[in-house]
């Protein structure tokens, strides 16, 4: 395992986010398996929230699909692995309020929780199944009139 992944693994163990991920996996009756780079994957997650097909808490990736279906979606796994790194950088569960703030910011700008969410953009929008959305019309007009980039701005 590369040094960066060992650091992520240790950071998420120390900051408690991986333990939280294991508790969420247990609550959702997910079946856990080891994955590459110090990650764990819980498949057949059963709780109704969140509605996403996959999500990450610490070094634990949780998915509603079975292992075969998830393994065939390498870009999604890479996207979720990037979220594990974000947990390490944000000090663990401190990432959650930051993530929700970024999601609200994105929704305010575009009407979509992921399109302008800096965590989703850094993890790779397309890899996570998200698409870029334009600014809401009023915001786009304001951006154009103030000389700021509108539609293509991040």
Task: Name each model-derived stretch.
Residues 2-36, 41-45, 49-52, 56, ...:
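Metalloprotease/metallohydrolase-associated module, dominated by Zn2+-dependent proteases
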Residues 51-54, 61-77:
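Short pre-active-site segment immediately N-terminal to the catalytic Zn-binding motif
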Residues 72, 88-93:
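Membrane-helix interface segments
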Residues 75-87, 123:
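Active-site recognition of the HExxH zinc-binding catalytic motif
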């Amino acid at each position: 395992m590369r040094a960066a992944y060992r650091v992520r693994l240790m950071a998420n163990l120390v900051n408690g986010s991986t333990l939280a991920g294991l508790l969420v996996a247990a609550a959702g009756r997910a079946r856990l398996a080891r994955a590459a780079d110090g990650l764990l994957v819980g498949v057949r997650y059963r709780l109704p929230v969140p509605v996403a097909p996959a999500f990450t808490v610490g070094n634990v990736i949780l998915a509603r699909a079975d292992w075969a279906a998830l393994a065939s979606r390498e870009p999604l796994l890479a996207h979720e692995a990037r979220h594990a790194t974000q947990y390490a950088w944000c000090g663990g569960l401190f990432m959650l309020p930051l993530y929700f703030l970024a999601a609200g910011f994105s929704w305010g700008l575009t009407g979509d929780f992921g399109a302008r969410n800096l965590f989703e953009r850094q993890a790779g929008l397309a890899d996570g199944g998200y698409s870029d959305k334009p600014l809401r019309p009023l915001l786009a007009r304001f951006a154009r009139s103030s000389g700021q980039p509108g539609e293509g701005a991040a």
